[in-house]
Design a protein with these regions (language model features):
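Aromatic, loop-rich ligand-recognition surfaces of beta-strand-rich domains
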Residues: 1-33, 49-61, 67-159, 177-229, ...
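Autoprocessing Asn-cyclization modules and mimics
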Residues: 44-46
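Solvent-exposed, conformationally flexible loop/turn segments
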Residues: 168-176
Length: 233
């Protein structure tokens, strides 16, 4: 009896931590675009990143390191492109902008390129408290969108959110807060590029600050790897 091919089991992506990537320049300056990194088939890019360089790098890849890097803060911090009001409004000029399904989404962004297409089931975002720097929690997303693409050009909406998110309290080491989003648009499609766009932040900060992002989903089925052959009597 032959069955298959099947989609593979639900997994976290990236499947491996992206650790000790490219360090930013010294001097506490904004990098536009942000410091990028490619490891083990994954590439992380962002619209901007900030940090004092060296071990104080706060590049996009830090949001996928599972806290295992030797950098000091282990967070992605964008440039200072938001007002310090509550919520913080996006004010970069010219704005970073992506169109998905006919709707324009503005905001700083962080993008993961995967080695294979996946169907996204859930998105986990962890805020960015660290040690005594609990004020970074104010840089967590308040309004934005999750987008998917297969050519890094044409984008589709997976999930939009506005009016704030319901954050569960976590330990400071975990970022101080966690939210899980479930796609509700284009839910059956598979994508190779996944992007978080942040239009507003919670407030009292001028940057997006994120400890960790985890995508959960299924890879495309593979006839060579995902088939089952059974003897039938």
């Amino acid at each position: 009896e032959y069955t298959g091919p099947h989609d593979r089991p639900l997994r976290k992506y990236p499947e491996v931590a992206i650790i000790n990537g490219t360090l930013g320049p010294t001097g506490g300056i904004v990098q536009t675009p942000g410091v990028s990194e490619s490891q083990k088939g994954y590439t992380v890019t962002s619209s901007s990143s900030w940090g004092n360089g060296g071990t104080d790098t706060r590049a996009g890849w830090c949001a996928f390191d599972e806290g295992k890097s030797t950098t000091t803060y282990k967070i992605w911090q964008s440039g200072n492109y938001y007002t310090t009001t509550t919520p913080g409004l996006y004010n970069r000029s010219p704005a970073q902008s992506h169109t998905a399904d006919g709707v324009n989404y503005e905001g700083e962004w962080i993008k993961l390129e995967l080695p294979r297409k996946i169907n996204i089931s859930a998105i986990e975002i962890n805020a960015a408290a660290y040690s005594s720097l609990t004020g970074h929690v104010g840089g967590r997303p308040y309004e934005g969108a999750i987008l998917g693409s297969n050519d890094d050009s044409t984008w589709s909406l997976l999930k939009s959110f506005s009016g704030g998110l319901s954050w569960a309290t976590t330990t400071v080491a975990e970022g101080g807060g966690r939210v899980t989003l479930t796609p509700d648009t284009n839910t059956t499609n598979k994508y190779r590029y996944i992007m978080l766009v942040v239009n507003k932040i919670q407030g009292s900060r001028s940057s997006v600050d994120i400890n960790e992002i985890k995508y959960y989903g299924h890879e495309e089925g593979s006839g060579s790897l995902d088939t089952t052959l059974k003897s039938v009597y």
